[in-house]
């Protein structure tokens, strides 16, 4: 606790909160263009080929984003929409691509949690 004379000398410093997704620049989503689509292996103890894309954003940043769901249609020059949200077992991946928007197709034959994967309601 500072004394009165310490407060006279200099005011209290405001604590600045560090954002977990700086490339979004305080926006909920950001548009970008895929520069590279590839697979990456997760940290120990997990094992898989996670689908990720390097994306150049309208904010000027180039970030790595995760492609959720089974199967995707993304390739270089695809226009995608990004949201925040890291992938715990992929270091450096702090963004998710939103399925079912712009050039990203929704997950085919998805029946549960459809809204998260841009899948339309089944016909039957």
Swiss-Prot record:
InterPro entries recorded: NA-bd_OB-fold (IPR012340), Ribosomal_uS12 (IPR006032), Ribosomal_uS12_bac (IPR005679)
Pfam family, one: Ribosom_S12_S23
Protein name in UniProt: Small ribosomal subunit protein uS12
Disulphide bond pairs: none
The organism's place on the tree of life at top rank: Bacteria
BP GO terms, sorted: translation
Keywords: Methylation, Ribonucleoprotein, Ribosomal protein, RNA-binding, rRNA-binding, tRNA-binding
Keyword tRNA-binding on entry: yes
Modified residues (3-methylthioaspartic acid): 89
Example GO molecular function: rRNA binding
Family, per entry: Belongs to the universal ribosomal protein uS12 family.
Gene3D superfamilies registered for this protein in UniProt: Nucleic acid-binding proteins (2.40.50.140)
Cellular component per GO, a single term: small ribosomal subunit
Keyword Ribosomal protein (UniProt): yes
Positions of region (Disordered): 1-26, 104-124
Subunit structure comment from the entry: Part of the 30S ribosomal subunit. Contacts proteins S8 and S17. May interact with IF1 in the 30S initiation complex.
Gene behind the chain: rpsL
Record's function text: With S4 and S5 plays an important role in translational accuracy. Interacts with and stabilizes bases of the 16S rRNA that are involved in tRNA selection in the A site and with the mRNA backbone. Located at the interface of the 30S and 50S subunits, it traverses the body of the 30S subunit contacting proteins on the other side and probably holding the rRNA structure together. The combined cluster of proteins S8, S12 and S17 appears to hold together the shoulder and platform of the 30S subunit.
């Amino acid at each position: 606790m500072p004394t009165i004379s310490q407060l006279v000398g200099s005011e209290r410093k405001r604590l600045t909160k560090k954002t977990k997704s700086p490339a979004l620049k305080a926006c909920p989503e950001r548009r970008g263009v895929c520069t590279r689509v590839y697979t990456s292996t997760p940290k120990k103890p997990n094992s898989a080929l996670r689908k990720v894309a390097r994306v150049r954003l309208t904010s000027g940043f180039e970030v790595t984003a995760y492609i959720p769901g089974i199967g995707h249609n993304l390739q270089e020059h695809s226009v995608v929409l990004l949201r925040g949200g890291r992938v715990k077992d992929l270091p450096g991946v702090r963004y998710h691509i939103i399925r079912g928007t712009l050039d990203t197709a929704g997950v085919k034959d998805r029946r549960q949690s459809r809204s998260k994967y841009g899948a339309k309601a089944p016909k039957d």
